Regions:
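Conserved beta-strand-loop-beta-strand element in the redox core of flavoprotein oxidoreductases
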Residues: 120-138
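Aromatic pocket-lining residues of Rossmann-like dinucleotide-binding sites
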Residues: 20
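Conserved N-terminal/central alpha/beta ligand/cofactor-binding core
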Residues: 25-26, 31-118, 122
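Short, glycine-/Ser/Thr-/acidic-enriched flexible segments
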Residues: 11-12, 34-35, 117, 134-136
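Phosphate-coordination loops involved in phosphoryl transfer and adenosine-cofactor binding
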Residues: 1-3, 113, 139
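Beta1/beta-strand and adjacent pyrophosphate-binding region of the FAD-binding site
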Residues: 1-12
Length: 142
């Protein structure tokens, strides 16, 4: 089984983690804060402009679980406002916990307050990552 460490639990890190877990990898997310989704907890905008197409492509490629959770917590769909067309807006106060439950339910190990401070290189490859508390992850796909 592959072991993968994902640095950062924002939308991209969560999506990458889900994909890796679905392919059979053992996955750890190192998140420096106390919650997932990062800046995704600020605006709550999903499926606007080009993101609509990207979302539908992601679903078609097997990434539906994350969007099913997002859709469940969407407050407004298909709205237009300056800079955004066809936007869906999810409830930023409610989305993080269900996403956390989803990834943990898939066997993904989420480690909060886990800041990566350094990487060790071997040539042009990452050999290990070092955490703020001194712990190192080695021999993983980073």
């Amino acid at each position: 089984m592959s072991k993968i460490i994902v640095i950062g639990g924002g939308w991209s890190g969560v999506a990458a983690s889900i994909r890796a877990a679905k392919r059979g990898a053992e996955v750890i997310i190192c998140e420096k804060t106390d919650m997932l989704l990062g800046l995704g907890n600020v605006g709550g905008i999903m499926r606007n402009n080009g993101r609509y197409t990207a979302t539908e492509e992601c679903i078609a490629l097997g990434g539906k679980e994350l969007f099913e959770v997002t859709d469940k917590y969407t407050k407004h769909k298909g709205i237009d406002f300056p800079g955004h067309e066809h936007a869906s807006i999810y409830n930023v106060t409610k989305i993080e916990r269900p996403v956390r439950d989803l990834v943990r339910g898939m066997g993904i190990d989420v480690r909060f307050f886990n800041r990566v401070i350094d990487v060790e290189l071997e040539g042009n490859k990452i050999r290990a990552v070092e955490l703020e508390d001194g712990e190192k992850y080695m021999e993983m796909h980073l």
